Amino acid sequence: MLNPSIDSLLTKIDSKYTLVTVAAKRAREMQLANNCVVEKPVSHKCVGKALEEIDMEALSYVPSEDKVTE
C-alpha cells in the first residue's frame, strides 16, 4: 500500500498530474543534493521521500499562470 495515500496527497495538490511532476522534480533534487526535509522517512527511495514531504506540507509549489491557447 502506498504511504502516504493518494487521497491524502490529493488534498495537498489539486491534480494527480501536478503531484507527479512536483514529486519527480523534488526527487531529482534529492538525488543530487541528498537533502531530505523529513527527519525519519518511511521510504528509502527519493520519490517516496518527496511524496512524504508533500504530505507533511514541507514542500509546496506555485501554480503557473500560463494558459494554453488554441
Swiss-Prot record:
Keywords: DNA-directed RNA polymerase, Nucleotidyltransferase, Transcription, Transferase. SMART domains: RNA_pol_Rpb6 (SM01409). Its EC number is 2.7.7.6. GO terms for biological process: DNA-templated transcription. It catalyses: RNA(n) + a ribonucleoside 5'-triphosphate = RNA(n+1) + diphosphate. Belongs to the RNA polymerase subunit omega family. The RNAP catalytic core consists of 2 alpha, 1 beta, 1 beta' and 1 omega subunit. When a sigma factor is associated with the core the holoenzyme is formed, which can initiate transcription. PANTHER family: DNA-DIRECTED RNA POLYMERASE SUBUNIT OMEGA. It comes from the Bacteria. One of its GO terms (cellular component) is DNA-directed RNA polymerase complex. This is DNA-directed RNA polymerase subunit omega. HAMAP family: RNApol_bact_RpoZ (MF_00366). SUPFAM superfamilies: RPB6/omega subunit-like. InterPro entries: DNA-dir_RNA_pol_omega (IPR003716), Pol_omega/Rpo6/RPB6 (IPR006110), RPB6/omega-like_sf (IPR036161). It comes from Bacillus anthracis. Promotes RNA polymerase assembly. Latches the N- and C-terminal regions of the beta' subunit thereby facilitating its interaction with the beta and alpha subunits. One of its GO terms (molecular function) is DNA-directed RNA polymerase activity.
